[in-house]
Curated annotation (Swiss-Prot):
Keyword terms, alphabetized: Transferase
EC class: transferase
Name used for this protein in its record: 4-hydroxybutyrate coenzyme A transferase
GO MF annotation, one: acetate CoA-transferase activity
Catalytic site: E238
UniProt-listed PANTHER family: ACETYL-COA HYDROLASE, ACETYL-COA HYDROLASE-RELATED
Presence of the UniProt keyword Transferase in the record: yes
Source organism: Clostridium kluyveri (strain ATCC 8527 / DSM 555 / NBRC 12016 / NCIMB 10680 / K1)
Family stated for the protein in its record: Belongs to the acetyl-CoA hydrolase/transferase family.
EC number: 2.8.3.-
Transferase is among the record's keywords: yes
Gene that encodes it: cat2
Length: 429
């Protein structure tokens, strides 16, 4: 049977597709911009048909209606990363959080520590051979589909076709729902003086020919702003946003010096505007792979001069980093931070950077603290922290004693907190 006939046989409405999900199933949603909006909406709309579905995903870009009060009988969310629409549910006990490194998520599915009953995915239209691309969301979505008993795909004509190892054949999909809604977009944030100063300090650590990992938000965008005079930069990152695209167009990022996948931008997912999605569509420079490859520290380390740039909530004077909680309150997750810090530390000539504003709470709270808040999660241990950067400078911690680490961190804290930090330093050292 030709793939076109298979496709037509599997084509149903969103309501019909989700009706195939059985009670008490574990349902994995595609990640971030890849969230299959029509399928999720149909699931929530028909909530009364379900009892005890476990909803698993990382970042949700939608409204997260399945986590709202009154939904507990129908849905229980298991967050692998806590985002804006799921934070309240996790901290109030209506949802759960599973700590994990991003690169390990596919193994949770494949090794059946989290057996997948249903995968709800969003993919591109099929090519002439019947292959759909996972587009903006390869990450754990492809492994989830490969592990699931039931695969329901939202085939969106607006999903870009990304290359690499990013494909699923229509014969491997159980039900197909066609969609034409625009992909969710994330607009670039406005950059303030603090972010620009941090970006400039980070950029001073990046040499020509380096391979970069950056996240999303004001600080990564500020770093990119100060890379315009660099040469032959490369990208091996869990994600990219619009700023990377602009540096490619400017010729700054060309991936020529990469020692792994030379000439290629390697990512596992994307978040940005339609311009970015159009840029990656059928672009042979951009390749996506599942997160157990892209974020594996033993893969990352194969890039010489690998520079990872991540942020956090707090750093204490020993160099311990909390990136996911305020005390006991879970506000995000581990994500790929530790994956890339470890990979950069193992890389020949690599650098692992934690970049943060010196204060929080409108300047009332120092992010550099004597100790992490009670109950705060240690996301990155003091043994793995290399550089810490604020708007006031750079602290290089690798190889330093606890005493010298503390002094270096106090020197880049906000001036109004340095005296109190030094007083705590004197009590301990």
């Amino acid at each position: 049977m030709e793939w076109e006939e298979i496709y037509k046989e599997k084509l149903v409405t969103a309501e019909k597709a989700v009706s195939k999900i059985e009670n008490h199933s574990r349902v994995v949603f595609a990640h971030a911009v890849g969230e299959p909006v029509d399928l999720v909406n149909a699931l929530v709309k028909n909530k009364d048909n379900y009892i005890g579905l476990e909803i698993v995903h990382m970042v949700a870009m939608g409204k997260g209606e399945y986590t709202k009060e009154g939904m507990q009988r129908h849905f229980r969310h298991n967050a692998l990363f806590v985002g804006g629409c799921t934070r309240d549910a996790v901290n109030s006990g209506r949802a759960d959080y599973t700590p994990c490194f991003f690169y390990e998520v596919p193994s949770l599915f494949k090794e059946k520590r989290l057996p997948v009953d249903v995968a709800l995915i969003q993919v591109s239209e099929p090519d002439k051979y019947g292959y759909c691309s996972f587009g903006v969301s390869n990450d754990y979505t492809k492994p989830a589909a490969e592990s699931a008993k039931l695969v329901i795909a939202e085939v969106n004509k607006n999903m870009p076709r990304t290359l690499g190892d990013s494909f699923i054949h229509v014969s491997d999909i159980d039900y197909i729902v066609e969609a034409s809604h625009p992909l969710l977009e994330l607009q670039p944030p406005k950059l303030g003086d603090v972010e620009k100063a941090i970006g400039e300090n980070c950029a001073s650590l990046i040499e020509d020919g380096a391979t970069l990992q950056l996240g999303i938000g004001a600080i990564p965008d500020a770093v990119l702003l100060f890379l315009k005079n660099k040469k032959n930069l490369g990208i091996h990152s869990e994600m990219i946003s619009d700023g990377v695209m602009e540096l490619v167009k400017a010729g700054v990022i060309n991936n020529k010096k990469k020692t792994l996948h030379p000439g290629k931008i390697v990512v596992t997912f994307l978040m940005g505007t339609k311009k970015l999605y159009d840029f990656v569509n059928n672009n042979p420079m951009v390749e996506t792979y599942s997160v157990d490859y892209v974020n594996n520290p033993l893969v990352i380390m194969k890039n010489d001069n690998m520079v990872s740039i991540n942020s956090c909530v707090q750093v204490d004077l020993m160099g311990q980093v909390c990136s996911e909680s305020i005390g006991l309150k879970q506000i995000s997750g581990v994500g790929g931070q530790v994956d890339f810090i470890r990979g950069a530390n193992l890389s020949k000539g690599g650098k692992a950077i934690i970049a943060i504003p010196s204060t929080a709470g409108k300047g009332k709270v120092s992010r550099i603290t004597p100790l992490l808040d009670t109950g705060a999660a240690v996301t990155t241990s003091r043994n793995e922290v290399d550089y810490v950067v604020t708007e006031y400078g750079v602290a290089h911690l690798k190889g330093k004693t606890l005493r010298n680490r503390a002094r270096a961190l106090i020197n880049i804290a906000h001036p109004k907190f340095r005296e109190s930090l030094m007083n705590e330093f004197k009590k301990r050292f």
